[in-house]
Amino acid sequence: MARLDESGLADLAAACESEDVLARWRAKVVTVEGSSCAWWTGAVSGRGHGRFWLSSGRVVVAHRFAFAVVHGVEAAAAVPVLGHRCDNPLCQRVGPGHIVASSYVQNRREWAIRRAHAGSPLGDPRGARQRARELRDMAREDPALVAVDLARLRALCGEQLALW
C-alpha cells in the first residue's frame, strides 16, 4: 500500500468510525466452513489482496482497513507491512495466525520458506492474482465452493506443515 498522507489518514480514520463504511466492508466478507479466515469478496489487486474504497477516489488494501479498525489508524500507519500468516491474501481476520504486523524483510523471508512447502497456497500454479480472483468468485457464489477448492489443492499438493 502506498503510504497515506495526512489527508489519507484522516479519510481512513473517518471510515473506521463510519457505520455505513463498516457495514459496506462487512458485506464483502464471508466465512467458509473449515477455514478460520474471513474471506474478502470485493475487488482484488494484481497481487491478490482485497481493495476497498473508503470514499470516492480513496482506495486502500482491504486487510489494512481491517487492521486499522481493530488496532486504530495510528497503529496501521506505523506498521510497514502486514503479513498473512494464513497465506491467504483475501483474509480479513486480524490476529495471530492471520493478519499480523510484520516487516518487509520478515514477510518476504516467511513467504519464501512457506512457498516451498508441499500444499502451500503460495505455490498454487494459478498464481496469486488468479487464485485470489477464482476463490473470491467462488466465495461470492457459494462459500462452500471455496472449501471444495481448498480440499482439491490439498489433495493435489499435499498438506502444508505448520512453519512455527
Where are these regions (language model features)?
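Short helix-coil boundary/hinge micro-motifs
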Residues: 1-56, 74, 86-94, 134-137, ...
